[in-house]
Every structure is written in C-alpha cells, then in structure tokens.
From Swiss-Prot:
InterPro entries: PyrdxlP-dep_Trfase, PyrdxlP-dep_Trfase_major, SelA-like, SelA_trans, SelA_trans_N_dom. This is L-seryl-tRNA(Sec) selenium transferase. Converts seryl-tRNA(Sec) to selenocysteinyl-tRNA(Sec) required for selenoprotein biosynthesis. The keyword 4Fe-4S does not apply. The modification N6-(pyridoxal phosphate)lysine is found at K295. It comes from Escherichia coli O45:K1 (strain S88 / ExPEC). The gene is selA.
Length: 463
C-alpha cells in the first residue's frame, strides 16, 4: 500500500464521529438511527473500494450528511410516484389510466379510514351482499336486471366464461379473437375458463349463417368481443348484437359480449367518436355484458358485468368470484364515479377523463402559447422551444384509430443531436414530479391535453 493510499484511507471518518455531528441529528430523527448507521457503513465500503480502484476519494466525501440525506430521500420515494402526463395519451395504461374524480377520491379516503357496510345489512344486522348497492346503481344506468363487480375486465371475462360455459363450446368470430396488453388473449382466457373455442367466419367477414352452422348440442354461448384496440376496414362483414341475439333465441343459446372500454354515455354528444354502450346491448337482449371501470368510464380499475338476473346469479355463486372480487376502496371509488352519471349535465366537468378528452384544440393552443415564453427563456440556449399542432390519443385500447386535435410544446436541439433529447427527457424523469413526454421526429413533444396544473409544471421544468 502506497503512502498516498494510506493517506486517503485515513481521511475516511469514523461512524461515531459522523453521528455526533449536528447535521446528522435530523437525519436520525427522520430515518432512524439504525438505517443511518447501516447506510454509513455501506458508504464507507464504497469509498474504500473507490480508493482501492482509483486512488481517489468519492466527491461526496466532502459532505457526508448531504449524501446520506440525498440517498435516503430517494430511497423513501414511493414506488407509485405522481407524474405529469404529457405523452398525448389520456388513458395511459403505464401511468395508471383514468384519473379519479374528486368525489371518488373522497369516497376512498372515507372507506379507508373507517369500517364500512361492505357486507353488512343495517336493516336486519345480518350479512349483506358486497355488490348490492353498486348493482342497483348499474341497473339504473344500464337497464340491466343485475350486476357483478370484479377487479378488472380480464377477470370479468374469465368469470363470465367459467361460470356459464365451462366444459362447453363458445362460438366467436375469428375477427374478434383479440389480444390486449400483456399478451391477454381471448383464446387463452377461454382455455383457463375450461371452455372450447369454436371459431367461425374469417378475419374480415363473418355472417349469421357462420354462427348458425357452428351451434351444436355442446354450445354454451355465442360471444361478441368488441375490437376496441384495433379496427378492420375495407371488405368487411359482421353481425351486430341484436341480430346475434335473435339468432341465439332461435337456437336457445345465450349471447354475451366483452365490450372492453365500456362508455356509459354517448361520446358523440361531446364531439368524440361514438363507442358502443352497455345499455344499448342490454336493450338488444344480450344476456351478459362486461366492460372496464378505468377506461372510458373514468373510474377505478374494475371489471363490471351487467345482464340477466339468472346469469349474474351463476357468476356470483361461482368459486372464482371470491378470488376476483373487488375490495372496499375500489367499490367506494366506483360507486362515487357511477353516481356522477346520474347527473349527466355536469359530467364533463366533474369526470376528469371526459374533461380531458373534451378539451378543445383552441384552448390547449392558448395554454401552449402562454407557457412557451418562460420555457424558451430557460431552455433557449440549447433548444428551440415551439408551439406545434399534434394529435392526442385516448389510449388503453379505446378508439384506436381516432385522434384528438391538440397542441404541444416541442424542444428541438440546436445542434440536431438526438442524444440531447434523450438527456433532456431523462432529466425530466428525475424531477421530484417527473414530466413525461415523447420523442418523435427529432423533437421532444409535450402534448398539453392533460396539463391542468400549470404552476406545478413550471415549478418542475424551471428548476
């Protein structure tokens, strides 16, 4: 060991001496004596390794308390960190999909802080039904006879098939054998539910007679799957639910539908593309309809099944129902969200998903112009900051081919180097509240459709 190396080792402080320093008192109060000591030992080992390999001290050895504070602060950050979503995708699956309405947030907070009547009947002091209150609300909105709630729509489809068609055949058009994120495929779900898939028709064309010819003594269901995350266009043919229900009645086979996104209002009244609604399918005579709670409905993650009472009863009594049931927080948020639909005139103001989807391009353009000046002043030395028109998307497999006119702030490096864009995006992801945009066509785009808190946005980007 050289004299220089010995000198470097000698500069490493003892843990006891560090802990006596006043700067460590607040750290010990905040994070605990044990964790601070544990980290200091780890940092001493790191410093010795750097000395051994590089014959130098780490830069942070100049201020041990500051480095300990920085590391423990980062360690204490929640795994579920709030972010500013400027990707242009409103229902971003990786960012948690639908933002919850204030009424839903308040309902969840109350449910978390207190015992609730989850399965308790106040009238006779006996055991109540977990889904009962929400079932009544869903029946009022959709016109169904009964309803069942589970933890997501994949679970809803699994339960629907397992409870009504296990050991039997389910007839589905080839053009509707969808796959959604995470390799969730309708054929795989059928296999897990114990059903046999009977494909009919072709990818682009399926006729009523295809279903008719497929039905046999082992057929349990005729199934429609709404292709919410892709679109087949051109030379196509499909039969709608009403026609399939008529065929099902003739052949004595129930019809079920996996609707996927599940909008409870006609989106076209807000200038958005129309999506099929559960109440329309119930009115057409479909026996069971499943859809998501956290997509176009704008609530928490949940799988909702509405339909005929005798069919719902089979789902409620199936062993899988207990494994897939929703908890009290989900039910509280979902109930509060559904109640907003009873007053549709205020829905676009109170439901964040609808509010963001219906923001006009003109309003977003004005917002972008307002924010351009301070950002250009801050980043102008390295980037050209411009206001550009763009197209937002709904996301989460909803209305896949439809885009919403919007406006973005774009950052283009003066030197044209893509690495500068990657570096800027990485810096923004490290902010206390990360700002998430997207890199495209030599620019970093911040689509402002989902930006409601301008002050917090500027606080982050002007740091």
């Amino acid at each position: 060991m050289t004299t220089e190396t010995r000198s470097l080792y000698s500069q490493l402080p003892a843990i006891d001496r560090l802990l006596r320093d006043s700067s460590f008192l607040s750290l010990r109060d905040t994070y605990g004596h044990t964790r601070v000591v544990e980290l200091l030992r780890q940092m001493l080992d790191e410093a010795r390794e750097v000395i051994r390999d590089s014959q130098t001290l780490p830069a942070w050895c100049e201020n041990w308390a500051q480095e300990v504070d920085a590391r423990l602060t980062k360690e204490a950050q929640s795994a579920l960190r709030p972010v500013i979503n400027l990707t242009g995708t409103v229902l971003h699956t990786n960012l948690g999909r639908a933002l919850q309405a204030e009424a839903a947030v308040e309902a969840v907070t109350k449910a978390m802080r207190s015992p609730v009547t989850l399965e308790y009947d106040l009238d006779d002091a006996g055991r109540g039904h977990r889904d009962r209150a929400l079932a009544q609300l869903l029946c009022r909105i959709t016109g169904a006879e009964d309803a069942c709630i589970v933890n997501n729509n994949a679970a809803a489809v699994l339960l629907m098939l397992a409870a009504t068609a296990s050991g039997k055949e389910v007839v589905v058009s080839r053009g509707e054998l969808v796959e959604i994120g995470g390799a969730f495929r309708i054929p795989d779900v059928m296999r897990q539910a114990g059903c046999t898939l009977h494909e009919v028709g072709t990818t682009n064309r399926t006729h009523a007679n295809d279903y008719r010819q497929a039905v046999n003594e082992n057929t349990a269901l005729l199934m429609k799957v709404h292709t919410s995350n892709y679109s087949i266009q051109g030379f196509t043919k499909a039969i709608d639910e009403a026609e399939l229900v008529a065929l099902g009645k003739e052949l004595d086979v129930p019809v079920v539908t996996d609707l996927g996104s599940g909008s409870l209002v006609d989106l076209s009244q807000y200038g958005l593309p129309k999506e099929p609604m559960p109440q329309e399918l119930i009115a057409a005579g479909v026996s069971l309809v499943s859809f998501s709670g956290d997509k176009l409905l704008g609530g928490p993650q949940a799988g909702i099944i509405v339909g005929k009472k005798e069919m719902i009863a089979r789902l409620q009594s199936h062993p899988l129902k207990r494994a897939l049931r929703a908890d009290k927080m989900t039910l509280a948020a979902l109930e509060a969200t559904l109640r907003l639909y009873l007053h549709s005139e205020a829905l676009s103001e109170k439901l964040p998903t609808l509010r963001l989807l219906t923001r006009s391009a003109e309003v977003i353009q004005i917002q972008a112009q307002r924010l351009q000046a301070p950002l250009a002043a801050h980043y102008g030395a390295e980037f050209a900051v411009q206001v550009m028109p763009c197209l937002s998307q709904i996301g989460s497999g909803s209305l896949p081919v439809d885009r919403l006119p919007s406006a973005a702030l774009t950052f283009t490096p003066h030197d044209g180097r893509g690495s500068h864009l990657e570096s800027l995006a990485a810096r923004w992801r490290e902010l206390p509240v990360p700002v998430i945009g997207r890199i495209y066509d030599g620019r970093l785009w911040l689509d402002l459709r989902c930006l409601e808190d301008e002050q917090r946005f500027l606080e982050m980007l002007l740091k």
